Amino acid sequence: MKTACLISTGTELLLGTTNDSNSVFLATRLLERGIKVIGKTVVGDSRETIKMAFASSLGLADMVISSGGLGPTRDDLTKEVACQVMGCEMVINQAEVKRLEDFFARRQRPMPESNLKQALFPAEAEIIFNPLGTAPGMYLKKDNKVLILLPGPPREMEYMFKNEIETRLERDFPQALNRVTRKTIKILGPGESQLEKILDGVIDDSPELSMALLAVDGEIHIKLTADGQDINHSKELMEKACQSIKEALGRNIVGYDNDTLLSVVAACLANTGKKIAVAESCTGGLLAKMITDLSGSSEYFWGSVTSYSNEAKMLYLNVKRETLEQYGAVSPEVAREMAQGMQKQSGTDLALSITGIAGPDGGTKDKPVGLVYICLADGGFLQVKEMHFVGNRESIRILAAKTALDLLRRHLKNGG
């Protein structure tokens, strides 16, 4: 697999006043094309640190892609320093001078003399046209290395990468780009450490297959990349790995690639023809919001009750006063009565209820912040799940709602 290092230049990136979205975009696009990013560096507008970054990156990877530092001002040093490291002499490119002059003429503005530095390039470099700004990019192949320089503004950088750089990568690295396959497996249930233990030894240790675990909003995404001798070999490696993971994780697998927990639950409900209603306390309507985020949810979603107070639980869900007084609002007993009451009020096949303590206040030694009870009712069947979530108020609410959806998914997948 071909490798790349990314360099982002700009003091504003180091100070944290600007997010480095360019590196995220580039790493994603490169991996999709079978090029592995093995390093990323963020440097300020300092000649020495920029020089060290390019020297180090060129020593590590097959290609180096830089964004930023191609403007006309004194602190725009990227191109000059990178070309010094590559041992290339820069000369004025008259075609670029003409383009810059036309750019300013169309805007009825005189071209500052400082902009001429943007027309300096090594004679052997391919100049990358920038229709959205004054800073052109550069693509240079030398000594089995590729140097790519792109402007810092994300809109300009992304346009140039998609329309100019990717065609050159396909030209220069056709074998790398055409033999890689990728798959994302989405998991809910085991945590990252537990999942790593489960998967230990499941996939053969091979340089042709890589696996990474990524935590995403309560889920764990397993990112698989197969880089075999050719595309067929890569597909075989991927199929074998996916089958091994499926056997190890079973129902913990929510879906693959573009699948979402909600889309999988929606498909299960559509297949069974069942309708659902939800009763929420600590999530404050978030579960209902998640369900209705998907177009067409009226086919299977009856509605919801947000019963935040004890009075609302009694009035709208028929939760008994004695149950609340004896066990408290956050209890498996109340979760059951909420689900049963919601099912009775709506007449639906299924009902979900959530009651808990999202924090930051309200917790006790016996019932700490993060304690949540979720109940699923299906006819006479009742299942209560006790969860202990860790995080702030928002994350606890999100985890509670997603766990409720996952409880429903597992029930429907098991024939419920």
Curated annotation (Swiss-Prot):
InterPro entries attached to this UniProt entry: CinA, CinA-like_C, CinA_C, CinA_KH, Competence-induced_CinA, MoaB/Mog-like_dom_sf, MoaB/Mog_dom
Instruction: Spell out the SUPFAM superfamilies in the cross-references.
Output: CinA-like (SSF142433), Molybdenum cofactor biosynthesis proteins (SSF53218)
Q: Name one Pfam family in it.
A: CinA
Q: Can you tell me which family this protein belongs to? A: Belongs to the CinA family.
Q: Which NCBIfam families match?
A: cinA_nterm, PncC_domain, PRK00549.1
According to UniProt, the name of this protein is CinA-like protein
According to its UniProt entry, this protein's organism is Syntrophomonas wolfei subsp. wolfei (strain DSM 2245B / Goettingen)
